[in-house]
Amino acid sequence: MEKTMGLSAKRSLPHYANERFDRWFSKHAVAGVDDPGTSRMPAIHTAAAITDRGYKKRGRVILWDDTFVRYHEPHIGIAAVKVLEALGFEVALVKNRRCCGRPAFSQGNLDAAANVGKHNVGLLNEGDHSSAILFLEPSCWSMFVEDYRELKIDNAETVANRCFLFEKFVDDLLAEDPDALQFEDRPATIAIHAHCHAKSIMNPAFMKRLAERLPGRKATVLDTGCCGMACAFGALAEKYDLSVQVAAHLIEKIDNQLPGTEIIASGTSCRHQIADLIPQLRRTRPKHMAELLAEALL
């Protein structure tokens, strides 16, 4: 890989999941049909999931299943669906969506990023004009709320106003309705690494508040900078050493946590970097906030 593609032999590669998230979601939607002898036809650009489980009904939300959730980390998408349905939302996915364009944008290929942006904004402007659009990956979310605007994509502003980071959306709802979710009470220590793209747009302090909505938990948002991975950057052989140097402060912070501390990181690149550089975490692995919440649900 290093000779043919320039990828560092020291860097692990993402694993492909046995089942794609969107395919799991399609089965999940069919399983939720009231009459098992029928199948519910999805809307043109969305596929509805289970809604009738006795939860308070709050309407529909659209979950943006980014590339890594779809192909590599479907368990994070499944966790998010579990939490959102427990809150009473009908969850939908966007059919025919394309990559948000972050890789192209980060490499300066603005035309390619604009093309996929126009496609995605067009999809989200058709049919359902009111549902919130939730993102699990901060780098995708920031494309929609910030970079599509800079690319001057038509209707980007309208769509951006409907886009929310999953964690912030859930925390805002629980601030208004603290009893909307019931969580297991158990003592645990949680350390949170906030994503650069999220920090550039909002104060990450809410993540501590959200984690501590789980009874018995004590959370800290680590005072850290970039993880040094930045998707393909940290995988390149010529950039690997620099990537590790950038991560040094973060890794030191995590190493200094109490044994058994749960590590939360919203970004897939951040989780990848942490797991690679702290081998003992590979058995417990860093988690997304959606997983922390879903695992604690009663």
What are these regions (language model features)?
Residues 1-298:
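Iron-sulfur cluster-binding electron-transfer modules in prokaryotic oxidoreductases
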